[in-house]
Design a protein with these regions (language model features):
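ABC ATPase nucleotide-binding domains
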Residues: 3-152
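ATPase nucleotide-binding modules
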Residues: 146-173
Length: 173
């Protein structure tokens, strides 16, 4: 949600309901679904507020609610926190993760922020120049990077030139 793409002339309720109305879902079902999803994203009671009266974090929640209310099979997040300040980024990534797990939806989360990727993901794909460098859990990638690029990208790393004299199963001299 680099751009939240909210409809500025619609209130929160109508922004979230928009996709359901396009699909011609009955009004009573729309109301129930929208109110339930707004509760999930902690925006209940704000249905009548205009989107330009909301903070960045609240706008993000409305955009997330609008996507979730349609019950997609997969949700794509493209740099969703890039427009938020550092403190709100931490709060929102925790919220996104919590909501994603509660709903049980598969999410693809694109980010250049390593700490964000490590904290929100079950599985990470690290890419460089359009090529997959490594796929694994955050723990696997952090503790067992398979290339210098991955090690440098994920953590604070020191690289030392060395010569292996003897190789064992777990250690080298």
């Amino acid at each position: 949600f680099q751009s939240y793409a909210l409809l500025p002339h619609y209130n929160v309720f109508d922004n979230v309901a928009y996709g359901l109305k396009i699909r011609k879902v009955p009004k009573d079902e729309i109301r129930e679904k929208v109110l339930n999803i707004l509760k999930l994203v902690e925006m209940e009671g704000m249905e009548s507020r205009m989107t330009n009266q909301l903070s960045g974090g609240q706008q993000q929640r409305v955009a997330l609610a609008r996507a979730l209310v349609l019950e997609p099979g997969v949700l794509l997040f493209d740099e969703p926190l890039s427009n938020l300040d550092a403190k709100l980024r931490v709060t929102m990534r925790t919220e996104i993760r919590k909501i994603q797990q509660k709903v049980g939806i598969t999410a693809i989360y694109v980010t250049h922020d390593q700490s964000e990727a490590m904290s929100i993901s079950d599985k990470i794909i690290i890419m460089s120049k359009g090529k997959v460098e490594q796929i694994g859990t955050p723990r696997e990638i952090y503790y067992h990077p398979n290339s210098r690029f991955v090690a440098d990208f994920i953590g604070e790393a020191n690289f030392l030139d060395a010569q292996v004299l003897e190789a064992g199963e777990e250690k080298a001299k």
